[in-house]
């Protein structure tokens, strides 16, 4: 088994991305990261994605990741059992926040449960029409809002703008994923607003959201972000400006699951480098 496939397709990489995104939020708000929450996010992400990919039905097109999943379903089961066990222990440790964490877990489950080909889960495919915003909202909740709640950060105007900024970045990335998955969603009767739009309309929505992302970034620059922090904040948005054309024309698993997923954590990664090499 190639380690790079295990790292990306085994959901280790995306789990690390989630942790780095949370670290970025903690450090942006000048609070000490909660180690238990970071561990919870890592294992909860591993649980969610292992469950999601284990349920992913067969598709007609060739996919390197899907082939890997077929060949390693038993390994995904082990990853799921290990991660859900760790998540349960960490949920007990974080029991003061049990309600909000449980609600977040439920929202995440609903997203993946639509892949289960049995009633009542099939019904979920008909209502997740705002799939793009739904997924971006879950990521924003986990990586920005929950760190603020756990750290008891005041929901100031700057915090709200930062939350919107992160949502817009993630939403733009989700647009590309949903455009790629439109044929699979049609086959599986999953309602997907992006899949129903023409490419011209998708392009307008994509760059409109990127424009709002840059506007919110400038607003943060006027509210205490220094120039280095501002450049770190906008760098993934700059890369997304030049990534639209290739993203809609390729189905490369590495492009989507390494590059585009990595853009979600890029600001956090750069911020950590800034801290290590001030």
Name each region found by the language model.
Residues 1-47:
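Non-cleavable N-terminal signal-anchor transmembrane helices
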Residues 6-14, 20-22, 39, 162-172, ...:
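Hydrophobic alpha-helical transmembrane segments of membrane proteins
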Residues 15-20, 79-86, 134-146, 207-215, ...:
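Core segments of transmembrane alpha-helices
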Residues 32-36, 80-118, 204-253:
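Transmembrane helix-loop-helix
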Residues 44-62, 170-193:
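Acidic (Asp/Glu-rich) catalytic motifs at the cytosolic membrane interface
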Residues 20-40, 87-100, 141-164, 216-229, ...:
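Helix-coil boundary and interhelical linker segments in multi-pass alpha-helical membrane proteins
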Residues 1-14, 58-79, 113-137, 192-204, ...:
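Interhelical loop and helix-boundary elements at the membrane-water interface
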Residues 19, 23, 41-55, 84, ...:
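Central hydrophobic cores of alpha-helical transmembrane segments in multi-pass inner-membrane proteins
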């Amino acid at each position: 088994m190639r380690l790079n496939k295990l790292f990306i397709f085994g959901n280790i990489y995306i789990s690390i991305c989630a942790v780095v995104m949370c670290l970025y939020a903690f450090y942006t708000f000048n609070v000490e990261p909660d180690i238990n929450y970071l561990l919870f996010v890592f294992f909860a992400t591993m649980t969610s994605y292992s469950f999601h990919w284990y349920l992913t039905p067969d598709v007609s097109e060739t996919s390197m990741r899907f082939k890997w999943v077929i060949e390693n379903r038993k390994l995904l089961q082990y990853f799921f059992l290990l991660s859900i066990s760790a998540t349960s222990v960490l949920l007990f440790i974080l029991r003061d926040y049990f309600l909000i964490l449980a609600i977040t877990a439920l929202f995440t489950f609903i997203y993946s449960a639509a892949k289960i080909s049995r009633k009542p889960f099939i019904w979920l495919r008909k209502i997740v029409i705002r799939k793009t915003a739904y997924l971006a909202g879950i990521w924003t909740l986990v990586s920005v809002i929950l760190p603020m709640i756990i750290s008891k950060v005041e929901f100031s105007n700057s915090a709200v703008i930062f939350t919107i900024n992160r949502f817009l970045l993630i939403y733009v990335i989700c647009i590309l994923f949903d455009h790629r998955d439109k044929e699979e969603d049609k086959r599986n009767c999953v309602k997907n607003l992006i899949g129903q739009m023409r490419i011209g309309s998708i392009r307008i929505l994509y760059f409109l959201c990127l424009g709002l992302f840059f506007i919110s970034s400038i607003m943060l620059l006027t509210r205490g972000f220094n120039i280095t922090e501002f450049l770190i904040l906008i760098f993934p948005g700059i890369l997304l400006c030049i990534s639209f054309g290739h993203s809609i024309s390729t189905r490369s698993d590495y492009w989507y699951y390494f590059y585009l997923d990595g853009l979600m954590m890029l600001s956090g990664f750069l911020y950590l480098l800034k801290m290590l090499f001030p």
